[in-house]
Amino acid sequence: MNQDQALKAVVEPATMETDRFGHPLDPIVRYARGSILKSSDEEIVRMLRARQIVGERVRKSGKDSVYDLSGMNRGSGITVQDVPHLTSHVPFFAHFEGKTEPLALKHMGADPARHAALILNRVSAANFIALTTLLKLGARVFAFAPTGGQTHPSAVRPISMVSADFREFHSYTELAKAWEAQGAPRLLLITPISASKRHLPFAEFKQALALPRSHETLVYVDDAHMASRIAFFDEPPTYQVGDIDLAVCSADKHVAGPRAGVLVGRTDLVTAIGSRAYELGLEAQAGQYVGVGNALRNFDPGAVKHAGELAKRLIQVLAEKYGPKRAYLGGPGVSIAGDDVLEMALERGGARGKPGLVAVEAAGLVAMQMLEQDGILTIGAVAMPGSAPAVRLMMYPDGPRLGIEPIVASLERSIDRLSRLVHDVPAARAQLLGG
């Protein structure tokens, strides 16, 4: 048994789950692997190819020729004024050391008297180091994720690595029933907004935090999309929701900062986790640390709200075109699940039988087509391995600049293209991976 098989064995259900078309679901990422995107290796090739397409387009036609509908910024976040103090670690220590953590506490609504912050190089790094520090063999983890969404693979993987017992719930009723029957777990892991942009009802979020705990129970919130919760759903920052021990948010998801994880929690927990993070080199480096500070200081919910208003108009158009059960409002954007996109392509092309593609490949093909032909950059093109298999059209940051009509037209052309590729695996492979 190799390492990947060993990790999957820990979370493998007794009965193998399948997608709508009968393909078995990978128990870590919770979507089907196909003949093209067979593993993380191929997903990385697709991601790097998309980056190359963006680069070539910008070099040829300028950066405004790409319309960023990813919901992310991922720039450096540093200013011209910052640069002279980043020439070595000496001026960095004098001007920036210790300045970002207080901003992180404020951003997440934490209490400086009880909480501390740690700036890490990714949310995935935060999930990895926090969960492998807090959990051990056999520890029970109850995960609470939105209906239609899942706990992120970056959290499932470390839970599997330590051989903890992972169970996922999608309603408060299910969670409370298991809690009463089995007792409080070691860890309650809550995902308020999933990678597929499904949203956990706020009332259920609060109810979960109110469940009775043992002296060993910890609550960890993967609040990567906290900015959307605040700006679009009008919910409070993480630590204003209820009693939480540890939480992470992103510095780049609907925040104008670099890709980084902002980990905030009880001081004793952050101290222990921080020691291991420094051992493994997961801490944010100088420029990233400064960029995170600037992004948190300058976070503008208004820009996200504005994008959200455009998303509300877009969902009306797409729900009418594709059906209200297929297109759904995912915060300040619109999403369509990969299985639905694949089904739409089959219907449009009149194809019969089991498709030659799986959901993650179908969603990826739509994303790559929109990027190559129209310069529209979505998460599905540049996402890391494990990202949800869905077409996600986030209106931040460039939705207002592009407008609804070009977005709808590009999506239509891309689904048409997909309808011609559902049984043409070689052509689909060429578009996803190149060569």
Which stretches of residues belong to each language-model region?
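Conserved PLP-enzyme active-site core in the AAT-like
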Residues: 2-13, 17-19, 24, 99, ...
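Conserved C-terminal alpha-helix-loop-beta "cap" of PLP-dependent enzymes
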Residues: 2-42, 327-429
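Conserved N-terminal alpha-helix of the aminotransferase class I/II PLP-enzyme fold
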Residues: 29, 37-129, 153-157
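Soluble or luminal CAZymes and related metallo-dependent hydrolases
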Residues: 96, 306, 362
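Short, low-order "capping/linker" segments at domain edges
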Residues: 305, 433-435
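Short, surface-exposed, charged loop/turn segments at secondary-structure junctions
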Residues: 90, 262-265, 349-351
